[in-house]
């Protein structure tokens, strides 16, 4: 396994120089259909997370904190809110120092007038722009995962190993590995096999219940990437995808190195795990948000050495009003964002995003309430997610009757109910 400290200061100087010559490309065009109605009008990377952020903020912050200041964000599906967020919150880079975040929506730039047909095709359709920046290395990233990672350490490994391509990887339970690219490596972490979403994932040697999975993070030597994408673009038998086509085709002919996430994961003192989450299902999204309300969550949002940057709306402080025995505004074991008012209501183990109004006599427990929600009096909301801008009618009860919840809303197998404006309209609310 790579030791990022073994070459000392020399590698730091070299890597810092190479980071300045690296171009990061964030793939942020996916819908994330498993999030159901949450992505009806927003791409998955634009979905709110952790009270005040968007999912894409974590990948962008990793770039900035790692010293990568040349970034392209590739968008496609319903990108308006994502583009707006980046324009408002990420305009602090200095163009005079060749720092930038370029927004690269699908524009049918190539012959055939096709939209992005796959992850590799998305990059190929922007090759002219990428060429113009003359990068030495291209870092390809997914914009829809939540994690903290120092990409400089991954680049150091790439350079030290003399790699053509480096693939970030993480150990996952074998039963969930079907949803990932699964790889096998030799004693030097050279990838000797790569299968994208296999029906029968190969377990790790000595760990029959674990598989080594791709994180969808790649470092390419730039010229090699250009050549590969040109060849892929004229291949009629390819799906134009990095995981399905590009990486498997390189394993035998090129030096493809696996970089273990634990070697570059940014962890806080006392952390119990290397935190990486695909919040691509309703259950996973709810669990990741609710975990942040615990005393010692797996993800530390308060680490000033690795800040998560975002758009900062001009909201007043959160407000809690009324203090009588039966009408007390309070929140316990919860995160409450700016602009919220908890008026004579009780909030427990919940996440309130910005500008949420919880009116008198309400009970909100184990709930994720997205921005600009108004919860009417006497409502009881438990184990649920309430979508952005929803007006919850007075007296609505969610989370107490599984059968009724399943009839009215989308309810997961784990018992999480998704409350949306569209479903409430069907109820006549």
UniProtKB/Swiss-Prot annotation:
Involved in the biosynthesis of ADP-glucose, a building block required for the elongation reactions to produce glycogen. Catalyzes the reaction between ATP and alpha-D-glucose 1-phosphate (G1P) to produce pyrophosphate and ADP-Glc. GO terms for molecular function: ATP binding; glucose-1-phosphate adenylyltransferase activity. One of its GO terms (biological process) is glycogen biosynthetic process. Pfam families: Hexapep_GlmU (PF24894), NTP_transferase (PF00483). It is an enzyme of class 2 (transferase). NCBIfam families: glgC, PRK00725.1, PRK00844.1. InterPro entries: ADP-Glc_PPase, ADP_Glu_pyroP_CS, GlgC_bac, GlmU/GlgC-like_hexapep, NTP_transferase_dom, Nucleotide-diphossugar_trans, Trimer_LpxA-like_sf. Belongs to the bacterial/plant glucose-1-phosphate adenylyltransferase family. It catalyses: alpha-D-glucose 1-phosphate + ATP + H(+) = ADP-alpha-D-glucose + diphosphate. Pathway: Glycan biosynthesis; glycogen biosynthesis. Its EC number is 2.7.7.27. Homotetramer. It comes from the Bacteria. HAMAP family: GlgC. This is Glucose-1-phosphate adenylyltransferase. Keywords: ATP-binding, Carbohydrate metabolism, Glycogen biosynthesis, Glycogen metabolism, Nucleotide-binding, Nucleotidyltransferase, Transferase. Alpha-D-glucose 1-phosphate binds at residues 116, 181, 196-197, 214.
């Amino acid at each position: 396994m790579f030791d990022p400290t073994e070459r000392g200061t020399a590698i730091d100087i070299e890597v810092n120089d190479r980071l300045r010559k690296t171009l990061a490309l964030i793939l942020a065009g996916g819908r994330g259909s498993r999030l159901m109605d949450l992505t009806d009008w927003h791409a998955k990377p634009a979905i709110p997370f952790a009270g005040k952020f968007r999912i894409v903020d974590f990948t962008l912050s990793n770039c900035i904190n790692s010293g990568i200041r040349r970034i392209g964000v590739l968008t496609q599906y319903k990108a308006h809110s994502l583009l707006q967020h980046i324009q408002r919150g990420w305009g602090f880079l200095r163009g005079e120092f060749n720092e930038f975040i370029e927004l690269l929506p699908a524009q049918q730039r190539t012959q055939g007038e096709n939209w992005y047909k796959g992850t590799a095709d998305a990059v190929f359709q922007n090759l002219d722009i990428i060429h113009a920046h003359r990068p030495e290395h291209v870092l390809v990233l997914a914009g829809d995962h939540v994690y903290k990672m120092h990409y400089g350490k991954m680049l150091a490994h790439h350079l030290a190993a003399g790699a053509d391509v480096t693939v970030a990887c993480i150990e996952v339970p074998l039963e969930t590995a079907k949803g990932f690219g699964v790889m096998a490596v030799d004693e030097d972490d050279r990838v000797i096999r790569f299968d994208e979403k296999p029906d029968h994932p190969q377990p790790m040697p000595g760990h029959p219940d674990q598989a080594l999975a791709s994180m969808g993070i790649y470092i390419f030597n730039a010229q090699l990437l250009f050549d590969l994408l040109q060849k892929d673009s004229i291949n009629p038998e390819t799906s134009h995808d990095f995981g399905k086509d590009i990486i498997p085709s390189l394993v035998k002919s090129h030096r493809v190195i696996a970089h273990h996430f634990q070697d570059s994961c940014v962890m806080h003192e006392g952390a119990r795990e290397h935190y990486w989450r695909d919040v691509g299902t309703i259950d996973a999204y709810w669990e990741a948000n609710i975990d942040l309300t615990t005393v010692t969550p797996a993800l530390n949002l308060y680490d000033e050495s690795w800040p998560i940057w975002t758009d900062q709306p001009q909201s007043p402080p959160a407000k809690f009003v009324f203090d009588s025995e039966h009408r007390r505004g309070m929140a316990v074991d919860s995160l409450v964002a700016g602009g919220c008012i908890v008026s004579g209501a009780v909030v427990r183990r919940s996440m309130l995003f910005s500008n949420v109004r919880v009116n008198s006599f309400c009970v909100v427990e184990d709930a994720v309430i997205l921005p600009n929600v108004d919860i009417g009096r006497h409502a009881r909301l438990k184990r649920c997610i309430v979508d952005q801008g929803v007006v919850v009618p007075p007296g609505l009860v969610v989370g107490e009757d599984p059968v009724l919840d399943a009839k009215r809303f989308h309810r997961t197998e784990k018992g999480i109910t998704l409350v949306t404006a569209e479903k409430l309209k069907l109820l006549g609310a």
